[in-house]
Amino acid sequence: MNKKRNAVEWAMHYRQIIILVVCCLVAFGIYSLPNMRKNEFPDFTIRQGIVVAVAPGNTAEEMVEQVAKPLENYIFSYKEVKKDKTFSMSRDGIVYIQVQLNDELNNKDEFWSKFKHGVSTFKAQLPKNVLAVQVMDDFGDTSALLITMESVDKTYRELDDYMDALQDRLRRINSIGRMTVSGMQKEQISIYLDTHKLSQYGLTEQTLAVTLFTKGFTTSGGRVKNPVYVQPVYVAKSLNTVRDVQEQIVYTDPIGNNIRLKDVARVVKEYPAPDSYITNNGKKCLLLSIEMKKGKNIVQMGEEINRTIAEFQPSLPSDVNLFCITDQSQVVGDSVDNFLHELLVAIIAVIIVVMLLLPMRVALVAASTIPITIFISLGLFHAFDIELNTVTLAALIVTLGMIVDNSIVIIDSYLEKLGEGVSRWHASIQSATHFFKSIFSATCAISITFFPFLITTTGQIQDFLVSFPWAISIVLGVSLLVAALLVPFMQFYFIRKPMESATNKNGKKKFSFLDALQKYYNKLLDLCFTWPRMTMALGLLSIIIGIVLMGKLPQRLMPIAERNQFAVEISLPTGTAVEKTGQIADSLEHILRNDPRVVSVASFVGCASPRFQTAYAPQIAGTNFAQFIVNTVSNQATEDLLNEYAPKYTDYFPEALVRFKQLSYNEATYPVEVRLSGENIDTLRREAEKVTALLRSMPELVLVSTNFNDPLATTRVVLKEDEATRLGISNVMLETTLAMRYGSGIPVATVWEGDYDISVKLKNSQADSANSCDLEDELIPVAGGLANVPLRQVADVVPAWENGQIVRRNGIYTITVMADLQRGENGMDVTGKVQKAVANLSFSPDVTLTYGCLLYTSPS
């Protein structure tokens, strides 16, 4: 009766099947490498959203009391909301609430759908002047590419037409998800009213607004219906051009004399002064943000987009250029190329190292298992829909050294048995069979080591690591099977002789590094067994020294992103006009662009860029904020520029804080954040001043500030009730009049030119260049516009200071004292110093101290 063969013996007998299967799997792995899913990071569930509520005319305090608090109470009624990380920022007329969801919530789309429906219903309970409440649940979506379309001479409208044509072409690429365009400035028809002429004819702004609104409003004209046919009725629009607006009759006297709009106002078609704009290398531009569909190959998508852009560029005028600011597909492609380079280096290193100890044939057999295992693993990744990203690439790199160990152990045993006189066939089978249990146990032990990560981590870190244990297990499992089933035949076929000690002409053994190593290793073993207590003591001492050294090493959970780009954030006092912000941004941009190491500078003035890197969240901007995305010639150039420019230009501009930010994978906004919470804002301010002074005295810190921002200079108009009532002036009439004359304009109609809408706005010529004296002397119409009185006659006009921003975290007022680090400082080390220093301060008993820096945003 034939003896039953084990797996190794079966593989030797049916080697043709094993070789065929291995070749097919390797070929599939080679095919999978360019075609499998690739991305920079694993798919994160960004459990964040933004709720924005707008209520013009409210101060920051009024926004807190009337809007933020009711919204917070409603938001906290959802059990899915993580309250301690949900916070609101109330500003002049607007409130932003960043909602953080619980880490265990995976189906965020279901929650946001339910939440949006609830918020739309809840809006009715807010004050009537709350114009809109919007929920943005795409806050965490990351742009795969940011592409600018720039020109010096073309108008925004022309650029928009070219951008539409580009989007039409890009939509043909199946892997592209959402595309959004930023930076568009639309034309408007501005009606600059002459208040003196209005008074002369007894007209008011409100009268004109109502007249123009009725001319521009479109509704159904009904239908002509009979038993045979139904004809819709369309009333032609009266406002179709600038001339139509100019020629509108706004007043007719009893004898038929007409007053047209052009008689009392200057009507022009123009680009209004923007509150925000985007430029690239000093040229006006539109920014196209491209996102990838989930589960697609970002490298292939990038190649298709670049091909499409190359084909589209010749169709554009010569002064219109396309430029790619950020390209995640290039980052991922470079990561794959770097891995292949590391793979080649590993194979060569194994061959060289093994050659020092063993013959060439042995080295080649051992080294050949590396590419075989890697490509089979890549094929399995593709088959199991595991994408190639930073985490899975890390798993492949970590296991490079482990892959070859299994093969070397079996080959070494094979050589030993050959030296004992065992036949090649039986030596090959016995070597693999003898060590299979040991190798299998080691593989299981190493694989199981990483699975507790899936239990101990939550939220974003778990999303980041979820594929790591599986990738490790697949690679090591493939390595085990290759060593047990393929290596036995490879060593049988290629290694035909045992290792023999070489001799010289005198018959003496030649020097062998392996023999020398074995000789001294045996001596060391003898010493260890002779002095067992000393051996144990040295082992214990080495563990203690290792623990001490580990505690002294600088720690950082999430690393710096090695990129050829960095960000710059410019912040000015609250209320700063976008023109002044633009001047400082333009000056710094010129400084950067004059450096040959800088390739491009994309400038966002009054706004923030889309999320172009997973951990770099978009900023909540205003007219006092600007941001750069700076591209450099290399990763090293980025380091050099930051080391040179950050210390020099952080405080270079008066009133401006300039933050040079190197991209990293940590989600903390600032590396050092000290939070003071309580119910009294004045108390919090006093305590925050202590912390601010302390942090500014520490040389490791720069850009120390608070999130309450600087006070906002305002003008408060208080009606003299008796005089105003006698003259028929109400709050609504006064607010409407001042809004028309000192605001960005009141929209009264829309003119359509095809698919291009042009807003018609009533405004005052001094709206963008006025001061407090002009406001006091402003003539307010009374008696239906037949007379005017200066504002100071019916109201007190007084300057006032208001809070620039009020922040509440978990429904409690919270001032955060923030600070950035000097270049080269370690965030966790500095945080420890800050904690020790702050511990020596005395705070009011009703103030709670917490931290929100790198140490506390990094999961343990």
Enumerate the predicted regions with their spans.
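Helix/segment boundary signal
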Residues: 2-13, 21-38, 113-149, 186-275, ...
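Transmembrane alpha-helices and their membrane-interface boundaries in multi-pass membrane transporters
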Residues: 400-414, 436-456, 463-506, 628
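Solvent-exposed, membrane-proximal periplasmic/extracellular interface segments of envelope transport
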Residues: 5-8, 12, 62-138, 196-217, ...
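Helix-loop junctions and hydrophobic alpha-helical segments within the transmembrane domains
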Residues: 325, 336, 411, 417-441
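Hydrophobic transmembrane alpha-helices and their membrane-interface caps
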Residues: 29-32, 348, 352-356, 360-415, ...
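Conserved small/polar residues in nucleotide/adenosyl-binding loops
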Residues: 856-860
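Transmembrane helices with small-residue packing motifs
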Residues: 16-17, 23-58, 62, 106, ...
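Signature of alpha-helical transmembrane segments and their immediate interfacial
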Residues: 1-38, 435, 447, 489, ...
